């Protein structure tokens, strides 16, 4: 995990916006201890200098790639700084569309030789967007506080899984099947963080409060037709789910250097 001025880094873009000239110190902790989650193996703590420059800056990144279909990404970052006040934000949008073709051949040698050939042509279309706004104020070298809010939205995540399968027994046709399944998903998420990092005499104060809430809405549909020497069968399965989640937590750490 990486912490910048006592606040946990939530996006790689936060690190990209840091200039080496603005970094006061970097501390790597290989044994984080009880103040961090048990699964955290190492912690990087970055302290920045009090901002000197003022003004507005921005960065825009556009990327595209092709894998049977075209996909696009667009990201805009901005930053405004005046005195010890720093305002930053990110707008991100992506549209991904693609195809994955797969072939699976399986042989089983039991009393008879069974062979299963499966052909799958997966298609997907996803669209998602992110908006982030953060405000930080560095009062002096010993006191800084701020707030960060992020909104994530996936209005469309559609997946199609058509698959055709043929089963043979000793090279004679035994069963054929065709299955078509679809999944449609939408999700919305919110993240809010408040932090304060300071030092009063010999005491170090580290406070963080986090809130995360959102939902996922998903529909699944599958239709399978089987033709076999033992008889034909057709099965249709549909399902709908909506999951809501929320988490709120706060942490206050007071540290004092022992004498000696």
Predicted features and spans:
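N-terminal periplasmic accessory domains that precede
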Residues: 12-13, 28, 38-61, 74
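Membrane-embedded beta-strand positions of outer-membrane beta-barrel proteins
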Residues: 58-62, 89-91, 147-149, 207-209
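Transmembrane beta-barrel wall of Gram-negative outer-membrane proteins
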Residues: 69-101, 112-160, 187-198
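Extracellular loop and loop/strand-boundary signature of outer-membrane beta-barrel proteins
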Residues: 61-63, 116-121, 175-182, 233-240
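Face-selective signature of the C-terminal outer-membrane beta-barrel domain
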Residues: 130-154, 180-260
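Short acidic/polar hinge/loop motifs at secondary-structure boundaries
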Residues: 7-33
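Outer-membrane beta-barrel translocator domains and adjoining extracellular loop/strand segments
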Residues: 100-112, 158-174, 218-231
């Amino acid at each position: 995990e990486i912490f910048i001025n006592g606040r946990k880094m939530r996006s790689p873009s936060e690190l990209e916006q840091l200039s080496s000239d603005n970094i006061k110190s970097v501390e790597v902790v290989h044994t984080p201890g009880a103040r961090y989650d048990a699964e955290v193996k190492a912690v990087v703590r970055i302290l920045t200098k009090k901002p000197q420059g003022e003004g507005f800056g921005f960065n825009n990144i556009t990327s595209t790639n092709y894998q049977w279909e075209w996909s696009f990404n667009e990201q805009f970052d901005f930053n405004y700084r005046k005195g010890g006040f720093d305002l930053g934000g990110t707008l991100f949008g992506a549209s991904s569309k693609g195809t994955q073709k797969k072939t699976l051949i399986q042989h089983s040698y039991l009393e008879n030789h069974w062979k299963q050939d499966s052909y799958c042509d997966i298609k997907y279309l996803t669209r998602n967007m992110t908006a982030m706004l953060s405000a930080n104020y560095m009062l002096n070298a010993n006191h800084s506080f701020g707030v960060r809010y992020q909104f994530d939205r996936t209005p469309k995540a559609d997946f199609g899984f058509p698959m055709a399968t043929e089963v043979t027994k000793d090279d004679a046709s035994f069963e054929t099947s065709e299955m078509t399944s679809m999944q449609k998903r939408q999700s919305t998420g919110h993240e809010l963080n408040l932090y304060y990092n300071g030092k009063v005499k010999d005491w170090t104060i580290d406070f963080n409060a986090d809130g995360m809430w959102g939902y996922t809405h998903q529909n699944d549909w599958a239709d399978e037709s089987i033709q076999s020497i033992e008889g034909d069968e057709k099965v249709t399965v549909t399902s709908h789910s909506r999951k809501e989640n929320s988490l709120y937590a706060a942490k206050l750490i007071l540290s004092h250097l022992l004498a000696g």
